[in-house]
Swiss-Prot record:
Phosphoserine, modified sites: S56, S60
PROSITE patterns: ARM_REPEAT, IBB
Protein name as it appears in the record: Importin subunit alpha-4
Compartments where located: Cytoplasm; Nucleus
Organism of provenance: Mus musculus (Mouse)
Gene: Kpna3
Ranges spanned by the short sequence motif Nuclear localization signal, renumbered to the chain: 43-52
Alphabetical UniProt keywords: Acetylation, Cytoplasm, Nucleus, Phosphoprotein, Protein transport, Repeat, Transport
Gene3D superfamilies named among the record's database cross-references: Importin-alpha, importin-beta-binding domain, Leucine-rich Repeat Variant
Amino acid sequence: MAENPGLENHRIKSFKNKGRDVETMRRHRNEVTVELRKNKRDEHLLKKRNVPQEESLEDSDVDADFKAQNVTLEAILQNATSDNPVVQLSAVQAARKLLSSDRNPPIDDLIKSGILPILVKCLERDDNPSLQFEAAWALTNIASGTSAQTQAVVQSNAVPLFLRLLHSPHQNVCEQAVWALGNIIGDGPQCRDYVISLGVVKPLLSFINPSIPITFLRNVTWVIVNLCRNKDPPPPMETVQEILPALCVLIYHTDINILVDTVWALSYLTDGGNEQIQMVIDSGVVPFLVPLLSHQEVKVQTAALRAVGNIVTGTDEQTQVVLNCDVLSHFPNLLSHPKEKINKEAVWFLSNITAGNQQQVQAVIDAGLIPMIIHQLAKGDFGTQKEAAWAISNLTISGRKDQVEYLVQQNVIPPFCNLLSVKDSQVVQVVLDGLKNILIMAGDEASTIAEIIEECGGLEKIEVLQQHENEDIYKLAFEIIDQYFSGDDIDEDPSLIPEATQGGTYNFDPTANLQTKEFNF
């Protein structure tokens, strides 16, 4: 998991305050937001896309001479300014093919050759749509490169001409202009806002109609995703307001690529703070978003989980909107999903519900999800265990005594204590805080809790943590031992000793505590 030390420190400090506000308990993904996305290689998730080489009717015999010889950049450059339209088109096609045919197209060589102004000039040629198309394609591929290469296209004043081409009567020219603008917008918030300021949104959204070919609509949706990306700064509020109605239409689409992109767009918007979350809620899309958590396509589930997960980082009221859509009924399947990253995101979602009010905590309990969270705490990969630790600790702060008592009855303490020996000091502190909260809430039953902690090896781990280099951790460890373990030795209850297995792990009997202990916090 990507770390943000400043934020984590702030979060940890807040964590120690029993009455801390929900804003500090709820956790945004920060750098982690890209983790699932980066592991995907699906084209629809890329910020920029190169248009691949395709032999088509566009590639007529006019470029036969160029195919027959190894054309130099100098020749391309010279012929691209020819007065002979056939020669000029062949040269621009040759440039486009250089940019389309190779895994590492010679973008910098072409930029250095001085061809950019020539290609941009070709965009003006309304009398020759084939030339406009080829030039737009070449510029699209240049803009698909590095940020510096994209900036070279922007600085050549291509953007106003691409916007003009959105009104071309030739659909292939329109579509190529859309693709080029998508690459430029995908470069970052500065380019995004520049293209928005020139008026891209209205003509772009006008393409969303029943007659548009599916490939064109996929491109339009991908550009909408890029308009919604980036939150430093987020897109202008007016732009979000313009885009949301389109997303509310596209979320019904049966094409998987369009659906996935639509949901990712919503996830980016909900990652932009509570005001943008509210705009998404007000659009009415949430009831249509939640059922996608059980979509048969993992790509759709992943995007939907991120989008609803971002919404529940908002206020209790915003969280309740999602809960009111029966969202928790989807979580047994998500928590037992074969993909670990889905498990992790699902537990992250639930950690933000257990950071809510007591009714929201109860909803998680009533949905039967606590045992599944505890299973992930014990058996999940480390990233998932970390999220589960937050979910449990948040519950010890937000929950009522009976809710925390239920947590203990589900045998949360042994797997919780196991995390005290990990190297991640953030996790260690979250667990210590959770244990301390449980002990405090147990009141007269604290000795029973202390006994469970000792029997599962937790006390030994806490004793070691008194030597921890982190001041907050060693102080907390000392406080717990001083307040709850400094008296007479607790009589050992043999029924609580875990059975050792091969490999040095332990099998904890989940019924042992219930048989031998009565919890009345």
